[in-house]
Each structure stands twice: as C-alpha cells, then as structure tokens.
Amino acid sequence: MSWKALTILLVFSSTQATASCRWSRAALFPAAHRPKRSLSLPLNPVLQTSLEEVELLYELLLAEIEISPDLEISIKDEELASLRKALSFHSICNNIIPKRIPDIRRLSANLANHPGILKKEDFERITLTLAYTAYRTALSEGHQKDIWAQSLISLFQALRHDLMRSSSPAVSS
C-alpha cells in the first residue's frame, strides 16, 4: 500500500471518528443542542442539579399537568408554574422531549444501541419522556392505548437496562 493511500485512509478514519463523536453527543435529544432562536433556553438544559431540584421535579410531575391539542405541556398550579425551574421544565417538555409516537420509537431504538451509561441530562429527559408517555397511555383508548403502552414499555426497559449497567460492580470501580 502506498503512503498516499495510507494517509488518505488515516484522514478518512479520523474524520469518521470525529464526526461520529459529534453526532453521538446529540443523538438521543438533538433538540437540546439546537435551541429555537425565540427561546431563552440555554444550550442543553438540565433540571436536576441538587436534591432540592429533584424534589421540585417530583412536585412538578405530581402537579396537575395539561396537554393541549398541539401537544403543549403546561402546569395548572399557578404558584408552581411561576417558579424559575418550572419555566425550565416547561421549555424542556415542550422543546426537547419527543411527544409523537414515531419520535418516541426512534428514541427507544437509539437507546437500545446506546453504548455505555447515559449522561445525567439524557437520563432526566428519558424519565420525562417516560412520564409523558405514561400520561398519554392513561388518556388513550383502544388501539392507541396499546401503541402508547408499547412505547412506555420500551422506554422503561431502556431505563432499567441503564440502571442495571450503572449499578454493576464492573462499571462503578
């Protein structure tokens, strides 16, 4: 093999590795890395950075949530909805997590092929997607309920698989 061919091969493989690293960064939730210009949402936002914020997230999830016909998620409790983290919750739920069956199935397929342990922000978004899917499953009827339930099961299995991987002794050492 000539040195020119070897050089081209090395450059090509380096380009492939660089491109795949950049792609995998946003593969699960590409919208988190492409915020809309009209939003004041930071790039790749995260809700939970402390125990208090985890408790607030549970409070937001337990509050009465409303989903409009255009799939816009809002919190009915005005006091909770006025909090700064509730605004982040609203932005993440309405601009980042998938809300249509094909998008949720795509996320499940990407999770099945995801190497390693999920990042904190990806785990958080998958959990929010799981909560959204459970909510839609409860509201649906007939064949639609079965489709939403299957999506719910797929997401749950992916999260469980990630938790099992992250708690195994080989990973934690």
From Swiss-Prot:
Its main location: secreted. GO terms for cellular component: extracellular region. Pfam families: FAM180. Residues 1-17 form the signal peptide. It comes from the Eukaryota. InterPro entries: FAM180 (IPR029170). It is found in: Secreted. Keywords: Secreted, Signal. Belongs to the FAM180 family. This is Protein FAM180A.
